[in-house]
């Protein structure tokens, strides 16, 4: 399920609302038979805060959510986002937070666009345990300096410069065997009728996955 947002750096009132919303979302997951929910840390980071403090705050927030999610049999997938204002911007930062949390029901949502847009390198994936990878989003990304790509520059696989085959082979090497879905933010794609978008997603993903699995 996509997504529970702004789970860290919450004021007291916001924290109470988050608890109520998360309980509702986790209950919905159980009714729908959905075992995993995407989590986004925060876009409201205090100015001047250190990376270590962000890690602690995010880990503490995830620990609280983990307890609540466990009551419903739901896993939490933290997504790092290489966009302005995001508190968790890189693969390495996300992996560090997951190490601090160290809960079986808290893992990572790996997005190829954010990975490449944030300047991460394919070899970094070798350090990720397969049991900490819960979801995979795939889209292509143009070659840009780290953190300069625009979110609208999120394309169908094969229409950008991301090493998607290498990345997905590295994901496969972790032992991950879960969902792998297309997530494209190109406004031209978002304007397509749903049926056309689904067909195009299949046309671009099936050949990519076939090459990865050779």
Residue ranges and their predicted role:
Residues 24-27, 33-35, 88-110, 114-214:
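Histidine-acidic metal/acid-base catalytic patches
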Residues 4-6, 187:
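Short active-site-proximal "capping" loops at secondary-structure junctions
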Residues 1:
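Zn-dependent metallopeptidase/amidohydrolase metal-coordination segment
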